[in-house]
A protein has these predicted regions:
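Electrostatic cytochrome c docking/interface patches
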Residues: 24-58, 134-158, 260-263
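Flexible, polar/low-complexity N-terminal or interdomain linker segments that lie immediately upstream
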Residues: 226-284, 292, 373-377
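Positively charged, proline/Ser/Thr-rich regional signature most characteristic
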Residues: 259-333
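Catalytic cysteine-centered active loop of the rhodanese-like fold, especially the PTP/DSP P-loop
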Residues: 314-360
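Bacterial N-terminal signal peptides
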Residues: 8-17
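Extracytoplasmic electron-transfer domains, predominantly the class I c-type cytochrome c fold
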Residues: 24-25, 76-77, 81-132, 174, ...
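Periplasmic/extracellular electron-transfer cofactor-ligation site
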Residues: 49-51, 56-81, 102-111, 135-140, ...
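Bacterial N-terminal signal peptides that target proteins for export
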Residues: 1-8
Length: 377
């Protein structure tokens, strides 16, 4: 597990462009102005918008796979609970909005805003947020944005003792949130972070520390986390059109890829990379939201978001033993969903990339970056 965390941290550092924004500026970044999508982008770069009328249906289609049918969290890859009263009750609206819109780049949490290639329109995001707030049953009283004064050096020691086990030695995340992530630090105010440390989140592994740590100790942890900020700004990138599914098969005239399998369901990154190097025949499907494909993907991979269903792609896929390899960042939830759907359609050669795309990239295997450099900030 430690090796995996190191690889994820290395990938995050590699693909996150350091902004000129000073960490101090991040302290006051507590409101985000939602932007509306370009109709041209929405039509050409991803699937049609979700309906804005039914937040429950939006959640079930796009969120439940990882966050759980009842918002309980931890259904896949430690995705957090979305029904915690402390989260819904205290988080600024801009924090919730940005988390849905921009996700957490280089983690399993993708961007869902349509201007980034995601499936949700401006109105659909509002419907989802309104539904999450309503279902929580709590009265929202977002904490006031008051800067916290603390000692980052002293906070380092407190963090190492009480936080690193879940959140990672460098804040890269683990079973807990990636607290050093640029988007998190740019959108979570000092007061919100302090409130979360003190009060915890019911129904999650995040316990309250108000009775275990003094107020200065909590403030010092906040100062330590704030010192990790590198700056982040929202942007609206240029999106590339998805590739033609008629070209789904890579190296169509070559022999089928020879892959190392596990349990008849998973194939190793090492064997897939070797087959790519040998120029063998295969199909690669990116099961993440289109926004992640726009950011980076395995060379030649087709976007096949887990929430879209496989029916439209089926006519373009070979059913002659050619390996069809789906991947995601979870590393198995979204890709497994797609593979299960393909197997039901009779594609028995469908497999899951065992390590997922983040570990794939961390191991130095080929990655195609998106057309717009701002996507890699």
């Amino acid at each position: 597990m430690q090796e995996v965390r190191i690889l994820l941290l290395a990938l995050s550092l590699l693909m996150t462009t350091t902004s000129s924004v000073h960490a101090k500026e991040s302290e006051t970044t507590n409101e985000t102005s939602p932007s509306k999508a370009s109709a041209k982008q929405a039509k050409s770069a991803h699937a049609p918008h979700a309906s804005s009328q039914d937040g429950a249906a939006i959640y079930a289609r796009y969120c439940a796979l990882c966050h759980g049918d009842d918002r309980q969290g931890y259904a896949a890859d430690d995705a957090p609970s979305l029904r915690s009263p402390q989260l819904i009750g205290s988080a600024p609206g801009s924090y919730l909005w940005t988390a849905i819109s921009y996700g957490r780049p280089n983690t399993p949490m993708a961007a869902f805003q349509d201007t980034l290639g995601g499936p949700l329109s401006h109105d659909a995001q509002h419907a989802l947020m309104d539904w999450l707030i309503k279902e929580s049953g709590v009265k929202r009283t977002p904490v006031k944005d008051e800067p916290v004064v603390g000692d980052a050096t002293l906070g380092t020691k407190v963090y190492e003792q009480h936080c690193a086990e879940c959140h990672g030695a460098e804040g890269e995340g683990g079973t807990g949130t990636a607290l050093a992530h640029p988007v998190f630090l740019a959108t979570a105010s000092d007061a919100f972070i302090r409130h979360t440390i003190a009060n915890g989140r019911d129904g999650t592994p995040m316990t309250a520390f108000a009775e275990r740590l003094s107020e200065p100790e909590i403030n010092n942890v906040v100062a330590f986390l704030r010192s990790r900020a590198t700056g982040w700004k929202e942007s609206t990138p240029t999106l590339a059109p998805p590739p033609d599914p008629a070209n789904a098969v890579l190296n169509p005239s070559a022999a089928p890829a020879k892959l190392d399998e596990r349990e008849g369901r998973f194939v190793s990154a090492k064997s897939v990379a070797a087959a790519m190097e040998r120029g063998e025949r295969m199909v690669l499907l990116d099961a993440r939201p289109m926004s992640d494909w726009q950011r980076s993907h395995l060379p030649g991979a087709l976007p096949m978001p887990f929430y879209d269903g496989v029916k439209e792609l089926v006519p373009h896929l070979p059913n002659d033993g050619t390996p069809i390899i789906a991947y995601c960042a979870c590393p198995h939830a979204a890709s497994g969903h797609v593979v299960d759907a393909l197997i039901k359609e009779g594609f028995t050669s469908a497999r899951i990339l065992d390590e997922g795309v983040l570990i794939w990239a961390g191991l130095g295997y080929p990655i195609a970056l998106g057309a717009d450099p701002s996507l890699n900030q």
